[in-house]
Curated annotation (Swiss-Prot):
GTP binds at residues 29-35, 71-75, 130-133. SMART domains: ARF (SM00177), RAB (SM00175), RAS (SM00173), SAR (SM00178). GO terms for biological process: anterograde axonal transport; antigen processing and presentation following phagocytosis; antigen processing and presentation of polysaccharide antigen via MHC class II; autophagosome-lysosome fusion; calcium ion regulated lysosome exocytosis; cell division; chromosome segregation; early endosome to Golgi transport. Its main location: membrane. NCBIfam families: small_GTP (TIGR00231). Belongs to the small GTPase superfamily. Arf family. GO terms for cellular component: axon cytoplasm; cytolytic granule membrane; cytoplasm; cytosol; early endosome membrane; extracellular exosome; late endosome membrane; lysosomal membrane. This is ADP-ribosylation factor-like protein 8B. Transmembrane segments: none annotated. Residues 1-19 dip into the membrane without crossing it. Keywords: Acetylation, Cell cycle, Cell division, Cell projection, Cytoplasm, Cytoskeleton, Endosome, GTP-binding, Hydrolase, Isopeptide bond, Lysosome, Membrane, Nucleotide-binding, Protein transport, Synapse, Transport, Ubl conjugation.
Length: 186
């Protein structure tokens, strides 16, 4: 009986108390940022993505949480914009092409440079190693090591290995994001 009442209360709350969160999605070009947004928004995967020029904003609703996603271009000329769009968000999602080992060092440097900005202090970070379905893709343990994530001490940091194409670990990624809809923004 108590479980039924609890479920009814949760349902009732979901009708009237909607959560909103804002996140910024950054990472080097061709890591799969826009594809990730499309997969969580509609479940659609496409091989033929056009690189993001500047930024895109999209709202995605999952349950009673509306996620406002800033998808920022990853080409070198757009990286100076990353900090501006990361200020005041609930979480930063940093996407890596886990199968492109040649770009890992550049990706690590960009992530650490971004997180060194004082205005972004304390904002939780979710690092996603995309394209785990490809041969030689780094797994979570390798990503944590190669990206030197253990050196990041001033905030919560989490790392998942995902595949937008196969939709691997998209569910746990969404769970993490929804949990952080309650994170305070400054």
């Amino acid at each position: 009986m108590l479980a039924l009442i609890s479920r009814l209360l949760d349902w009732f709350r979901s009708l009237f108390w909607k959560e909103e969160m804002e996140l910024t999605l950054v990472g080097l070009q061709y890591s799969g940022k826009t594809t990730f947004v499309n997969v969580i928004a509609s479940g659609q995967f496409s091989e033929d993505m056009i690189p993001t020029v500047g930024f895109n904003m999209r709202k995605v609703t999952k349950g009673n949480v509306t996620i406002k996603i800033w998808d920022i271009g990853g080409q070198p000329r757009f990286r100076s914009m990353w900090e501006r769009y990361c200020r005041g968000v609930n979480a930063i999602v940093y996407m890596i092409d886990a199968a492109d080992r040649e770009k890992i060092e550049a990706s690590r440097n960009e992530l650490h440079n971004l997180l060194d900005k004082p205005q972004l202090q304390g904002i939780p970070v979710l690092v996603l190693g995309n394209k785990r379905d490809l041969p030689n893709a780094l797994d979570e343990k390798q990503l944590i090591e190669k990206m030197n994530l253990s050196a990041i001490q001033d905030r919560e940091i989490c790392c998942y290995s995902i595949s937008c194409k196969e939709k691997d670990n998209i569910d746990i990624t969404l769970q993490w994001l929804i949990q952080h809809s309650k994170s305070r923004r400054s």
